[in-house]
Regions:
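TPR alpha-solenoid repeat register
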Residues: 47, 81, 100, 134-135
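Alpha-helical segment of the N-proximal tetratricopeptide repeat
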Residues: 7-39, 103, 107-110
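Alpha-helical linker/edge segments of TPR/alpha-solenoid repeat scaffolds
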Residues: 61-62, 91-107, 141-153
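Residue-level recognition of tetratricopeptide repeat
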Residues: 10, 44, 78, 114, ...
Length: 153
């Protein structure tokens, strides 16, 4: 049995509810909302990113990475499957790509893969010099010797 397709306004409502639940640290509610979006639109890049963020907070890193990779792949469709030269946080498609890359960087960092994480953080800074995600600070932490996301200063 296929899940019922939701109307666009319901998809956007669920999507917004997912991010609101994430901000309130209500991870199971966020997961349920993002899964609801993905049941209708399995390529909704920012719902994939949201689900990746839920899994990241639950330390389900393989699942988080998979969601961020799917989100990145979906986001790149807007750019004809090529990485753009510049993105701007204020543009929704750009923001979605930044979230995917940032999520992948955080997963690498939490795993202690500092070289991979720093490379991704620097790529985010190159693409989006305004650095709305704090990638510059994360890269600086790595250069200062902080080995993982969870390491206390």
């Amino acid at each position: 049995m296929t899940p019922a397709k939701l109307p666009p306004q319901e998809i956007e409502h669920l999507y917004a509810a997912g991010w609101a639940a994430l901000q309130a640290e209500m991870l199971s509610d966020a997961e349920e909302a993002f899964l609801g979006v993905l049941a209708t639109d399995p390529h909704h890049a920012d719902a994939l990113n949201g689900l990746g963020t839920v899994y990241f907070h639950e330390k389900r890193l393989d699942e988080a990475e998979a969601m961020y990779e799917k989100g990145k792949k979906s986001a790149l469709k807007f750019f004809k499957d090529k990485m753009p030269d510049h993105v701007d946080w204020s543009a929704p498609h750009d923001r979605t790509l930044i979230r995917s890359l940032h999520g992948l960087a955080l997963v690498a960092y939490r795993r202690g893969k500092t070289a991979a994480a720093e490379k991704l953080f620097n790529e985010i800074i190159r693409l989006n010099p305004k650095d709305n995600t704090g990638a510059r600070f994360m890269a600086a932490d790595i250069r200062k010797g902080k080995k993982t996301w969870d390491q206390k200063s």
